[in-house]
């Protein structure tokens, strides 16, 4: 079964959106496999966003991510990377329709509440970085009611 990495950014944590966001993934039928509330340092944030290091917004992004606690999660399910991105919405909240997390809760691209892996390969890399100890090995009893 496919896995993805989802991070609720400091603005999402500060605004009390953690439960709402988790609920959206649970209601879709995805299984939570890992969950951490933590504050990361600059080196860790730079490693996570290394692929964006040449972008002009990189330093501001790193400062934003280290400004407060984040919630790091691993979700599992069929097509969870692609579907998770649809649940989240476009990177720019102005381009995210109502009903998506960013469409409902974000206004500015620099405070867009949530990060989600953009591909299976990046999900594996991000899960390895954020959860080096691994994730919970369990299956929901609801799987037969969700999957064919």
From Swiss-Prot:
InterPro entries from the UniProt entry: NDK-like_dom, NDK-like_dom_sf, Nucleoside_diP_kinase, Nucleoside_diP_kinase_AS
Cofactor: Mg(2+)
Xref: CDD domains: NDPk_I
GO biological process, one term: CTP biosynthetic process
Keyword Metal-binding: yes
Pfam annotation, one family: NDK
GO molecular function: ATP binding; metal ion binding; nucleoside diphosphate kinase activity
UniProt function note: Major role in the synthesis of nucleoside triphosphates other than ATP. The ATP gamma phosphate is transferred to the NDP beta phosphate via a ping-pong mechanism, using a phosphorylated active-site intermediate.
Official protein name in the record: Nucleoside diphosphate kinase
Protein source organism: Helianthus annuus
């Amino acid at each position: 079964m496919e896995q993805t990495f989802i991070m609720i950014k400091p603005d999402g944590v500060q605004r009390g959106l953690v439960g709402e966001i988790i609920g959206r993934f649970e209601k879709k039928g995805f299984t939570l496999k890992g969950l951490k509330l933590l504050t990361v340092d600059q080196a860790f944030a730079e490693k996570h966003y290394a692929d964006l290091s040449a972008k002009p917004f990189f330093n501001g992004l790193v400062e934003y991510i280290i400004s407060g606690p984040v919630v790091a999660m691993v979700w599992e399910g069929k097509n969870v990377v692609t579907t998770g991105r649809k649940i989240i919405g476009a990177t720019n909240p102005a381009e995210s329709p109502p009903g998506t997390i960013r469409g409902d809760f974000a206004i500015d691209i620099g405070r867009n509440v949530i990060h989600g892996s953009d591909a299976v390969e990046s999900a594996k890399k991000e899960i390895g970085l954020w959860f080096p100890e691994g994730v919970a090995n369990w299956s929901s009893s609801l799987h037969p009611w969700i999957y064919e």
